[in-house]
Swiss-Prot record:
Residues 39-92 form the WAP domain. Keywords: Disulfide bond, Glycoprotein, Immunoglobulin domain, Metalloenzyme inhibitor, Metalloprotease inhibitor, Protease inhibitor, Repeat, Secreted, Serine protease inhibitor, Signal. Its main location: secreted. It comes from the Eukaryota. Protease-inhibitor that contains multiple distinct protease inhibitor domains. Probably has serine protease- and metalloprotease-inhibitor activity. Inhibits the biological activity of mature myostatin, but not activin. This is WAP, Kazal, immunoglobulin, Kunitz and NTR domain-containing protein 2. It comes from Homo sapiens (Human). Primarily expressed in ovary, testis and brain, but not in liver. In fetal tissues, it is primarily expressed in brain, skeletal muscle, thymus and kidney. The record marks 140-141 as: Reactive bond. The gene is WFIKKN2.
Length: 576
C-alpha cells in the first residue's frame, strides 16, 4: 500500500517540477512563486546631498511643500529647497564601492509604463532610475498659442515647458487680443472697441519688447537668512534673463539660469536666490531681459543687517529731525580708518542709493545701513520715472502703451495690463518723448559711464594720475583742464616725473558742454584720472575713467601694479 502511494506522490512532484521548469524557461514566473514587485519606497538621496552644486530649484516653485518622504511619490524625496522649506523632488542615486545604489533600485530601469503626470514633463533615466523632468528643448517653428494664464507663447511646447517649470496646468484658449507690435518707431495701431480675434497659428510674426509683471521691491533681511528675487517678465519671443550685481570698481559677473556662484543661485526659471546672506551681499541686483524686440533692466535692492541692528535701521534720523540735505551731496567716505563694511550712500548723479565700502572715518553722514534708510533720508522727490522699467502689471485689460528705455535711449511700445503700473507709462510715443529722459536739475543728462571698470581702464590707459582740477576752459566740442598732480601711478609716454610742481594740461575731446563727460569740474576733491597720449599731449575722451579718489581704489591700483595684473590681461584679453 505504501509503495504505490509513494510512487504516485513522486510522479505528481515530477510533473509540478517539470511545469515550473518550463515556465521559468519561458520567462513566466508561476503565480504562487511570483517575485515581489519592485518598490522604490523613497529610496535614494536628495540632490544637494549628492553634490553641493545640485540644488532643489524652483521647478516646483516651492509649492509642493513637505515635511517627510511619506508625503511624496514613492520615487521622490522630501528635500530642502530654495525657499528655506522642503519640497518633493525626484531622488538621485550614486554608485558606492561594492554597491549599485540603494536597495530597491532596478538594475536596468526603462521609461516603459512610467507615467509623468505633470504637464510638459517627460521621462528620463538618471543614474539608472526613471525620473520626470521638464522639457529643455522646443521646436523653433512659430505657432503662437494663447494660454489660460493670459500670455501668448511661441508655440505649444513653450506653454507646456512653462507649466512644468511652475508646477501648474495651462490650457489653450482662444486669443481675444492681437496686437502687431513695432520695434520702435511707428506708433501702435489703433484698436477698435471690439478687438478682433486671431488664431494661435497666425503666421504673422508678433513681437513685443520685455515688460515686467510686478514692480521690483527692496528687501531687507537679517544675516544668515535666505532671500529671493523673481524677475517676472513677459515678451514675444520669450525674453532671455540674466542677473548681475552692481559692483564697486569691479566688472559685474553675469549669471544665467542654472548658475551657482558661492551662496548665490539662479534657478531654471531665472529666480535669483541668496542663501545665508551676509553683509557683503547687500547691493543692487540687476535683472536684464532681452529679446529681438528690445531689452529691459530692473534693479532689485537688497539690504543685509545684523540682528540687533534691524530695529534701529528703520529710523532715518534721530528725534524725528530732518536729515541735512547737503550731506546727501557729499561723496562716499571710502577712506580706511578701521573695519570695512558694506554701506549705502546717495549718488546724486544716479539719483539713487548705491553700496560702497565704508571705512568708519565718519567724515560725513552720507552712509546708511539699508537702502530704505538712504532713500528716506536723501530722496527729495520721486524716483526718475523714465529710469523705471516698463511694467505690464498683473491685470489683463490689455492696452498698447509707450515707455522710455534707458538702455536704448528711445521710447518703445509695450503691453499694459491696466493696473499697478508705474510712471514710465505713456499713451503715445509723442508724450513719452516729451517727458523723457528724466530731467535732472536744469539738464537732461545721464550719468557718465567709463568704457571699462577701474582695473581694465588702468591697463588700457597711457597715463594714470591722482590730482585736482584747478582750471577748466570750455571750447566748441572740446576743452582744456589744468590738473595739479599729486601722484603719478602710470606714465608710458610723457615723462611726468620731470613735471615737478607744474600743473598738467589735459585736452578734453568731443565734449557736449550741455552734459559734459567725463564729468570734470574745478574742485579740491582728489580725482583718479586715466587717459591717452597722442603726440605728447594728455587727452580724455567722453568714456575715459575719471572718478573720486579713495584709499580703497588707490590700494587696488597699487596691488595691480605690484602683481603685474596688466601683463596677464594683455596676454589673455588682447589689451594694448
Amino acid at each position: 500500500m505504501w509503495a504505490p502511494r509513494c510512487r504516485r506522490f513522486w510522479s505528481r512532484w515530477e510533473q509540478v517540477a517539470a511545469l515550473l521548469l518550463l515556465l521559468l524557461l519561458l520567462g513566466v514566473p508561476p503565480r504562487s512563486l511570483a517575485l515581489p514587485p519592485i518598490r522604490y519606497s523613497h529610496a535614494g538621496i536628495c540632490p544637494n546631498d549628492m553634490n553641493p552644486n545640485l540644488w532643489v530649484d524652483a521647478q516646483s516653485t516651492c509649492r509642493r511643500e513637505c515635511e517627510t518622504d511619506q508625503e511624496c511619490e514613492t520615487y521622490e524625496k522630501c528635500c530642502p529647497n530654495v525657499c528655506g522649506t522642503k519640497s518633493c523632488v525626484a531622488a538621485r542615486y550614486m554608485d558606492v564601492k561594492g554597491k549599485k545604489g540603494p536597495v530597491g533600485m532596478p538594475k536596468e530601469a526603462t521609461c516603459d509604463h512610467f507615467m509623468c503626470l505633470q504637464q510638459g514633463s517627460e521621462c528620463d533615466i538618471w543614474d539608472g532610475q526613471p525620473v520626470c523632468k521638464c522639457k529643455d528643448r522646443c521646436e523653433k517653428e512659430p505657432s503662437f498659442t494663447c494660454a489660460s494664464d493670459g500670455l501668448t507663447y511661441y508655440n505649444r511646447c513653450y506653454m507646456d515647458a512653462e507649466a512644468c517649470s511652475k508646477g501648474i496646468t495651462l490650457a489653450v484658449v482662444t486669443c481675444r487680443y492681437h496686437f502687431t507690435w513695432p520695434n520702435t518707431s511707428p506708433p501702435p495701431p489703433e484698436t477698435t472697441m471690439h478687438p478682433t480675434t486671431a488664431s494661435p497659428e497666425t503666421p504673422e510674426l508678433d513681437m513685443a519688447a520685455p515688460a515686467l509683471l510686478n514692480n521690483p521691491v527692496h528687501q531687507s533681511v537679517t544675516m544668515g537668512e535666505t532671500v529671493s528675487f523673481l524677475c517676472d517678465v513677459v515678451g514675444r519671443p520669450r525674453p532671455e534673463i540674466t542677473w548681475e550685481k552692481q559692483l564697486e570698481d569691479r566688472e559685474n559677473v553675469v549669471m544665467r539660469p542654472n548658475h551657482v556662484r558661492g551662496n548665490v543661485v539662479v534657478t531654471n526659471i531665472a529666480q535669483l536666490v541668496i542663501y545665508n546672506a551676509q553683509l557683503q551681499d547687500a547691493g543692487i541686483y540687476t535683472c536684464t531681459a532681452r529679446n529681438v524686440a528690445g531689452v529691459l533692466r530692473a534693479d532689485f535692492p537688497l539690504s543685509v543687517v545684523r540682528g540687533h541692528q534691524a530695529a534701529a535701521t528703520s529710523e532715518s534720523s534721530p528725534n524725528g529731525t530732518a536729515f541735512p540735505a547737503a550731506e546727501c551731496l557729499k561723496p562716499p567716505d571710502s577712506e580706511d580708518c578701521g573695519e570695512e563694511q558694506t554701506r549705502w550712500h546717495f549718488d546724486a548723479q544716479a539719483n539713487n542709493c548705491l553700496t560702497f565700502t565704508f571705512g568708519h572715518c565718519h567724515r560725513n553722514l552720507n552712509h546708511f545701513e539699508t537702502y530704505e534708510a538712504c532713500m528716506l533720508a536723501c530722496m527729495s522727490g520721486p524716483l526718475a520715472a523714465c529710469s523705471l522699467p516698463a511694467l505690464q502689471g498683473p491685470c489683463k485689460a490689455y492696452a498698447p502703451r509707450w515707455a522710455y528705455n534707458s538702455q536704448t535711449g528711445q521710447c518703445q511700445s509695450f503691453v499694459y495690463g491696466g493696473c499697478e503700473g508705474n510712471g514710465n507709462n505713456f499713451e503715445s510715443r509723442e508724450a513719452c518723448e516729451e517727458s523723457c529722459p528724466f530731467p535732472r536739475g536744469n539738464q537732461r543728462c545721464r550719468a557718465c559711464k567709463p568704457r571699462q571698470k577701474l582695473v581694465t581702464s588702468f591697463c588700457r590707459s597711457d597715463f594714470v594720475i591722482l590730482g585736482r582740477v584747478s582750471e577748466l576752459t570750455e571750447e566748441p566740442d572740446s576743452g582744456r583742464a589744468l590738473v595739479t598732480v599729486d601722484e603719478v601711478l602710470k606714465d608710458e609716454k610723457m615723462g611726468l616725473k620731470f613735471l615737478g610742481q607744474e600743473p598738467l594740461e589735459v585736452t578734453l575731446l568731443h565734449v557736449d558742454w550741455a552734459c559734459p563727460c567725463p564729468n570734470v569740474t574745478v574742485s579740491e576733491m582728489p580725482l583718479i584720472i586715466m587717459g591717452e597720449v597722442d603726440g605728447g599731449m594728455a587727452m580724455l575722451r567722453p568714456d575715459s575713467f575719471v572718478g573720486a579718489s579713495s584709499a580703497r581704489r588707490v590700494r587696488k591700483l597699487r596691488e595691480v601694479m605690484h602683481k603685474k595684473t596688466c601683463d596677464v590681461l594683455k596676454e589673455f584679453l588682447g589689451l594694448h
